[in-house]
Amino acid sequence: MQVGNIIEFGKYDWIVLDIKKDRALIITEHIVEQRPYHDAYTEVTWADCALRKYLNGDFYDEFSMADKLRISPVVNKNPNNEWYGTSGGADTEDRIFLLSMEDAACQYFGDSSSLLYNPRKNQRYWFERKDKNNSKRVATLESNNKQVWWWWIRTPGRVGVKAVYIHGDGNIGIQGNNILKGNIADGKCTGGVRPALWLRY
């Protein structure tokens, strides 16, 4: 197994992002579903959001017992939003999780750390449309792999009712999308979900 490989696990294809000893960090190749980040329009962090509860509950339970034994629990740090200082909340022990903003910006889709840590003087919203690594973050729907969609990151946005996301063009929405209420027809902010996990191999 090597970084960049696509492997089958459960009912999805996953991309290998990192390898440490006998474990690999993997993320679904496609957006496997669309869900709000939380089930109430109130300030929340990853530790208490409905999406985390779902991923470590119903989504995790879809795996066979043999597959569950291969999923390694991990303690995730949840840093504050680098630009806005919004609290990332408590550390969490997760079996299934979303990537953090640092994961997406600095580690697993090329290194754009200089853009994350050195915003321009008046830059407040879009991360960086000319980021050369944007294309590496673009994702399509599992149900229609020709349809590009935006997907959630677990880091909070500029306020506690928003969470960071990856735009359809791969750009990092550092200010965040609303965790529940959106401007689309059903009134909900149904962001794409790309679960990640550490897999024993």
Indicate residue ranges for each PLM-predicted region.
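Collagenous Gly-X-Y triple-helix signature in extracellular proteins
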Residues: M1-Y201
